[in-house]
Every structure is written in C-alpha cells, then in structure tokens.
Amino acid sequence: SDLCQGCLAHPCMEVCPKKAITWESGRSTIDQEKCIKCGRCATVCPYNAIVKTERPCAAACGMGAIHSDELGRAEIDYSKCVSCGQCLVNCPFGAIADKGQIYQLIQGFNRGDRIYALVAPAFINQFPTLASTGKLKAALKALGFCDVVEVAIGADLCTVDEAHDFLEEVPGKLNFMATSCCPAWSMMAKTAFPDLAKNISMTMTPMVFTARMMKQADPEARMCFIGPCAAKKLEASRRT
C-alpha cells in the first residue's frame, strides 16, 4: 500500500520465497503473477504497509465456497455452497443475486391460478410499527393470493414428527438427533460432517409440511413461500 516507507532493510523482499517483491520508485512492489499469498511479507513489514484484503463475500462464507478465478473474479464452488445467502447480503456491489420468481408469480395471477401465500413466522415482525398481521394478510390477498397460510403450522407438525423419531431412535439407535428444519444446515452437516449425516432427522421441513398439507386440501392450487431464507429456494426446487 502507500504506507511503504522505503526502508533500507527491505525485510519483505528478503522473506519472499518466490522473489515476487521488487524495488521500484523508492518502494516495494509486489508482482501479483508470482505472489503465492503466503503472507510472510505482511508479517515482517515493520510499518504494516502490506495488507491482506479479503472479499466480503468470501469472508462471509462459512463453507469456504468462494475463491478467485484466473482473472481475479469471485467464483462460487457449488459443491461446497449450501445456499445460505450470506455472500448475497454481504456483497457491497450487488454482484451476487439469487434467482427471482416474481415473473412466474405474476403469470400465475394473470392466468387466474389459485395461489396460496405460505408465510414464514418471521413475517410478523417485518413491519412491526406499520402494519398488523391482519393488514399484511389483507395486503397479500389484495395482490392476488387466494389465501394466506402461516408456516408456523408446519413447524408444529414438524416438531411432533421429530419428537416421534427422537423417541424411537435415541438413544437406542443414535446417540443424538439433529434437526432437519434448516436446509442450509442439513447441507452443511452432510458436506462437512458426512459421518454424522445419519444423525440428521428425516422429518420434512416446516415449509414442506405446510405445502403438502395445503396441496392435500386443494390439489389444483399452487404454493408460494414467502420468507427470509435463501436456502428455501433450493429446497423448493428439489423433487422429493
């Protein structure tokens, strides 16, 4: 950085194993083509002039799924990605976007499809001082939804089902049981801790419970989940 003081010792040049640092115009310059990002130069610089910068998206990713390609652009490794959405909300440039389905929803309204709004429990606090639960439900119906259903119902069904599984499996067959409510968590556990995958409950998520319940009541209707979790989109796209 511009903090380089042009010291006579040049410790950064001495410790670089790839000779990637040269002396130009009175200060040290790093050749990015040779640099292997080992960090030795930053460690020995007495003026803290060498700073390691990290992409906000990569720093936010707990799975290490984001790296730089040969052109220095951020690239997502989908074999590690769990669709948690942290890179999306932490990118200061809006360069990462999830797949929107607003167009398909509008098409459904225009066709006259019966579409239920399945709202996550978090909706109740989205506009705490501006709109009550009743107003939010009325607004969704005014948009074209035939009815509004709270996914909290599915959460209750999920709890009961998981409780039955727990009583049958623990501690006789399993030493513990992990919840399956969060699709991002389930993917992370199966990817990072494959030996513990068997301990994850096979119970459906609250969203799936609610959607199936409504499908049984109204087979011709379509379901639209509304919630803050990006991983739900990946979950909804699966055929299970």
Language-model features: locations:
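Residue-level recognition of alpha-helix initiation/capping sites
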Residues: 7, 36, 52, 82, ...
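Glycine-centered loop/turn motif at secondary-structure junctions
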Residues: 20, 49, 65, 95, ...
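Ferredoxin-type iron-sulfur electron-transfer modules and their immediate structural context
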Residues: 1-44, 48-60, 64
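Conserved Radical SAM active-site core
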Residues: 31-32, 37, 47, 56-57, ...
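Glycine-rich, histidine-containing beta strand-loop boundary motifs that form or position
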Residues: 16, 25-27, 49, 54, ...
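Iron-sulfur-associated redox domains of electron-transfer enzymes in respiratory
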Residues: 98-240
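Short Gly/charged-rich anion-binding patches and loops
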Residues: 11, 40, 56, 86, ...
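Transmembrane alpha-helical segments of multi-pass membrane transport proteins and ion-pumping complexes
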Residues: 6, 10-15, 44, 90, ...
